[in-house]
């Protein structure tokens, strides 16, 4: 039997997803709890795998890990795990086939970026966004890793205005390092007329002198991963701690925003 966990986390509390010695990461935190509870013996022995290695500061509402449970498989339940986790929540568990791999089985991944309105020209941003849809060489919009194919396909981009900010949603099967954050900054530059759509088209064709820098990571969240025939199960009781923790973060952020908003009004 193999299990998959749907996890969410506050990326600002971790130094990224991937395990690193001596620093707090999402993967490291989760493995520590799973081994402490004897659900797994070690990540190697129990085939621990993750879907997306989010960067430092990037949050997730839907990331996935899988493993073969050991001695205390009965404790691999959201309510038990959430009692032992901090800044990280298990939102569901699923039994999956033995050959399941959370990264390779993913049909698509969706990211959301929350961008404060700086007086953007929305039509220009939308026109620029359409250029990114489809299959392209994203070398100009990524931090390239040696030997990795820079060609990726984006199936959907949307820009939704809300009160004082925009939600940029980007969906594709896989992404390069910093790709989403660099695309967001390109859209931002287009909205401020610092970058023209024609320049974006040229960059996607391989014509560029410098790359677009990445937008800050703190406003990015891995929102959803689509899998074939995988159903994550949970219940209201299991989610109660996550709801409390998220509301606390929301309340704190809202109060700070109000505080600085009043300061701006008085200047």
From Swiss-Prot:
Record bears the keyword tRNA processing: yes
The UniProt entry, under InterPro entries, shows:
PsdUridine_synth_cat_dom_sf, PsdUridine_synth_TruA, PsdUridine_synth_TruA_a/b_dom, PsdUridine_synth_TruA_C, TruA/RsuA/RluB/E/F_N
Q: Looking at the Swiss-Prot or TrEMBL record, what is one Pfam family this protein matches?
A: PseudoU_synth_1
Which catalytic reaction applies to this protein? Answer: uridine(38/39/40) in tRNA = pseudouridine(38/39/40) in tRNA
Name the keywords, alphabetized: Isomerase, tRNA processing
Where does the record place the catalytic residues? 55 (nucleophile)
Q: Which residues bind substrate?
A: 111
| Entry EC number(s) | 5.4.99.12
Which GO terms of the molecular function aspect are on file?
A: RNA binding; tRNA pseudouridine(38-40) synthase activity
Q: Does the keyword tRNA processing apply?
A: yes
One Gene Ontology term from the biological process aspect of the record = tRNA pseudouridine synthesis
According to its UniProt record, this protein's enzyme class is isomerase
What the protein does?
Formation of pseudouridine at positions 38, 39 and 40 in the anticodon stem and loop of transfer RNAs.
UniProt record similarity statement:
Belongs to the tRNA pseudouridine synthase TruA family.
Protein name, entry field: tRNA pseudouridine synthase A
Query: What organism does this protein naturally occur in?
Result: Thermococcus gammatolerans (strain DSM 15229 / JCM 11827 / EJ3)
């Amino acid at each position: 039997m193999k299990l998959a966990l749907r996890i969410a986390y506050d990326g600002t509390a971790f130094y990224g997803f991937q395990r690193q010695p001596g620093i707090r990461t999402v993967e490291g935190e989760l493995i520590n709890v799973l081994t402490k509870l004897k659900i797994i013996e070690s990540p190697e022995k129990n085939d621990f795998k993750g879907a997306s290695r989010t960067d430092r500061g990037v949050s997730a509402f839907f990331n996935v890990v899988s493993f073969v449970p050991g001695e205390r498989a009965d404790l691999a339940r959201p309510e038990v795990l959430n009692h032992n986790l901090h800044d990280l929540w298990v939102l569901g568990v699923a039994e999956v086939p033995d050959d399941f791999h959370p990264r390779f089985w993913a049909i698509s991944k969706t990211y959301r970026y929350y961008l404060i309105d700086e007086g953007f020209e929305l039509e220009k941003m939308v026109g620029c966004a359409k250029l990114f849809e489809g299959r392209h060489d994203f070398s100009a919009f990524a931090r390239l890793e040696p030997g990795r194919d820079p060609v990726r396909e984006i199936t959907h981009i949307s820009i939704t205005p809300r009160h004082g900010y925009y939600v940029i949603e980007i969906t594709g099967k896989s992404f390069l390092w910093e790709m989403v954050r660099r695309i967001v900054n390109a859209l931002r530059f287009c909205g401020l007329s610092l970058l023209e759509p024609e320049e974006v088209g040229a960059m996607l064709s391989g014509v560029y002198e410098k790359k677009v820098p990445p937008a800050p990571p703190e406003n990015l969240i891995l929102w959803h991963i689509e899998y074939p025939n995988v159903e994550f199960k949970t219940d209201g009781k299991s989610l109660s701690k996550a709801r409390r923790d998220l509301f606390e973060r929301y309340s704190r952020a809202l109060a700070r925003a109000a505080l600085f908003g009043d300061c701006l009004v008085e200047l």
